[in-house]
């Protein structure tokens, strides 16, 4: 079994506020290409954390890929009350994260910052690598997790970058 943590930018961090934004199709095309390659290399578990944006788009791609490949998807939320204040549209997306093969919560609710450290350590200890949509030139809070991942010599990180998205777009696929 090979498990990969999937995480990256949230939609608002990318300035994507509509599900109909054409850039999302390019992102999903890149996700699909990358994930098929990972599956062919032996990845059979994809671990999500329930965030909107990249993770949700990855979830949509994974649900399609499950029809053709023997893969499993897990959502491991940091807190049971994750997303409880989201609007109705986002709550529907949250519900989709709860329809995967395995769902777990690390903590009932947020109490202190050390919970995030323990949560991230757990995610890294239970995955062999990560698939990240992240660029160090466009930092977010994800930078702390990325720094910890880089400290682990055997932890493989596959990045989806803005340059890669441009390549996918220029390939001229029908989006």
From Swiss-Prot:
Name of the protein in question: UPF0398 protein SUB1405
HAMAP family in UniProt: UPF0398 (MF_01575)
Entries under Pfam families matching the protein: YpsA
InterPro entries: YspA
Disulfide-linked positions: none
Family statement drawn from the similarity comment of this UniProt entry: Belongs to the UPF0398 family.
Lineage top rank: taxon: Bacteria
Species classification: Bacteria, Bacillati, Bacillota, Bacilli, Lactobacillales
């Amino acid at each position: 079994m090979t498990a990969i943590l999937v995480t990256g930018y949230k939609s608002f961090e990318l300035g994507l506020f509509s599900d109909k934004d054409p850039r999302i199709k390019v992102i999903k095309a890149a996700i699909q290409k990358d994930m098929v390659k990972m599956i062919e290399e032996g990845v059979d578990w994809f671990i999500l954390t329930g965030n909107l944006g990249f993770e949700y788009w990855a979830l949509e791609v994974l649900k399609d890929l499950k029809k053709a490949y023997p893969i499993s998807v897990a959502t491991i939320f940091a807190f049971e009350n994750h997303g409880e204040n989201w609007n109705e549209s986002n709550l529907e997306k949250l519900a989709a994260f709860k329809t995967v093969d395995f769902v777990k919560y690390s903590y009932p609710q947020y109490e202190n910052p050390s919970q995030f450290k323990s949560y991230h350590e757990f995610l890294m200890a239970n995955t062999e690598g990560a698939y990240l949509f992240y660029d160090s030139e466009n930092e977010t809070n994800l930078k702390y997790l990325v720094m910890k991942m880089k400290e682990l010599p055997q932890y493989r990180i596959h990045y989806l970058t803005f340059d890669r998205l441009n390549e996918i777009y220029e390939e001229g696929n029908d989006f």
